[in-house]
Amino acid sequence: MKVGFLSDKNGFRAPLHPDSLKKYDKTQLFVDKDIFKNLELNAKDYKKLKPLNKTSLKQMDVVCFVDTVEISDIKGLKRDAAVVGLFDAKAKKEIKKVRPDISLYDFFQLPRISRAQNLDALSSQANLLGYSSVLRASLETSNVIPMMTTAAGNISPAKVLILGIGVAGLQAIATAKRLGARVWGYDVRADVKDQVESLGAKFVEASSTSQD
């Protein structure tokens, strides 16, 4: 079976890691030339892998990607090939319309059950998203995040409100707390209150009112 790996268009992730190479026959793996362009990975681990291009794409049985895939990326795939990754809803619809003869395996649709835990790429990516979101937000604020005592006086800790208490939200709360912020969390589901408070944050309860 020949497997191809497309590069992440944002350049920060890759669908293939060096540790995984030991499990596969390297002669059957093909990689996009830009797949590790912006990643701090050892390039020598990939020198033995064959290039994925318009010619070799026609031979692939499976193509894997992380970020997004467009019809132009897989236009040359043979009939009955499979594409595996995290699909954008719009792109997925277009691919199905143009190439109904190939199979699409969308990790966004993977059920979050114990048996599929080692395949739960969505949760792992959401976890990283929550972490990186707080770090990026901290760079945008004009104040420091933790409380600080200086010669000019005390600086109060930043106040952070996290909207949505899913995998990303919980990681965002944990990261903001570690940075020293005062954190609140909000979700339309009141039953996540315990999860928010278990991380040391306060849960924002909003009551809905209606007007006649």
Positions of predicted regions on the chain:
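Glycine-rich phosphate/diphosphate-binding loop of Rossmann-like nucleotide-binding domains
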Residues: 7-41, 146-212
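Short, hinge-like loop/turn segments at secondary-structure boundaries
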Residues: 46-50, 121-125, 201-205
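Glycine/serine-rich phosphate-binding loop and adjoining beta1-alpha1 elements at the start
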Residues: 2, 72-157
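A short acidic, often aromatic-flanked loop/helix-cap motif at beta-alpha or helix-coil junctions
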Residues: 55-59, 110-115, 209-212
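N-terminal start-of-chain detector that recognizes signal peptides
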Residues: 40, 55-57, 132-136, 155, ...
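Residue-level detector of short coil/turn "hinge" positions at structural boundaries
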Residues: 48-53, 104, 183, 203
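An N-terminal-biased, well-structured beta-alpha scaffold segment characteristic
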Residues: 2-101
